A protein has these predicted regions:
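Scaffold/interface architecture of coatomer-like assemblies
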Residues: 1-302
Length: 302
């Protein structure tokens, strides 16, 4: 007797822009080429935000005393989280971290509760920043959400980790297995004059050798933490120095989350338990820049 197992769909949020960073809309299934370990797969493409699953977003915020100048800015953006990022049908949670992570607000659709969690942000009294531990907590919360929502993390912090017990490679793999996309808004705690600078632009992770980031622990250790996290999950890293820059970056992430294509396909049976590399190409658009996860882990859905 042959026992067959059900392999869950691979679902990929995909951002497609031109060389100037403008979203390319109006693409159809016929425009996409999906390569799974180099082999083409027949995929379904959905571009309607109203028809796709709701967003479950965890906002992960560094609350160390060394981030005091940034906390004053974060207190003003709580209203943007539910309204712009998770959306009317979605839900959001808030996690703060310094020497240890703490759930400040569990998942809710109540925009006022999210806003209150941001307004009540306070410094923790130390200079620690256990970013990876906080992300692991966020991933555990997201793992309890219904399987269908789009799962996102918005990390607002320094670009480095300060004293986590969790390992970068483990957090990366956990996020990939849960199909979570990580977006990062990073800052320098040593910048005291929070004024706009030419460097307040997206930091590209193109060409960083994503498979190497996933499979080589030594290389992961030498990589900027937030760059590794965003690149390995198909997210984006932005940086800010002033209030206007922070709010602009939140809007950029919001727009991207709600304008992505959702590409899905059924992986082969033999893929269960393995990591497969992915490449997505756009036909007849040499100017198209595609950003998504560099691969996927498959599990038995039973």
């Amino acid at each position: 007797m042959t026992i067959r197992t059900e392999v869950p769909l691979v679902v990929l949020p995909v951002t497609v822009t031109d060389s100037r960073g403008r979203t390319i809309d109006g693409l159809t299934e016929a425009d996409f080429v999906v390569l799974d370990n180099g082999k083409p797969r027949q995929a379904q493409v959905d571009s309607s935000d109203a028809l796709t699953s709701p967003v479950a977003l965890a906002a992960v915020l560094q609350t160390s005393d060394i981030s005091a100048a940034v906390l004053a800015k974060l207190r003003k953006i709580g209203g943007m989280i539910q309204e712009g990022l998770s959306g009317d049908r979605g839900e959001a949670a808030v996690i703060g971290f310094s020497s240890e992570p703490k759930v400040l607000q569990d998942f809710t659709r109540d925009a006022n509760k999210i806003d209150d969690a941001f307004r009540e942000l306070r410094g923790s009294g130390n200079a620690s920043g256990c970013m990876l531990d906080a992300l692991e907590l966020a991933l555990n919360l997201l793992s309890d959400r219904p399987r269908n929502p789009r799962r996102e993390i918005l990390l607002i912090s320094e670009s480095r980790d300060r004293g986590s017990k969790a390992k970068l490679q483990d957090v990366v793999e956990h996020a990939q297995r849960l199909n979570v996309t990580i977006y990062s808004l990073s800052y320098s705690v040593y910048t005291t004059a929070f004024t706009s600078k030419p460097s307040d632009t997206p930091q590209s992770t193109e060409g960083t050798g994503l498979l190497g980031l996933i499979t080589e622990p030594a290389r992961l250790a030498r990589t900027n933490t937030v760059e590794a996290l965003t690149a390995a999950t198909g997210g984006r890293r932005l940086s800010f120095t002033r209030q206007a820059g922070l709010e602009e970056d939140v809007l950029k992430v919001s727009k991207e989350i709600h304008s992505r294509y959702l590409v899905s396909f059924t992986p082969p049976q033999e893929a269960i338990g393995s990591f497969h590399t992915l490449e997505i190409q756009i036909k007849n658009r040499p100017d198209a820049i595609v950003r998504t996860r560099p691969g996927y882990w498959t599990v038995n859905s039973n």
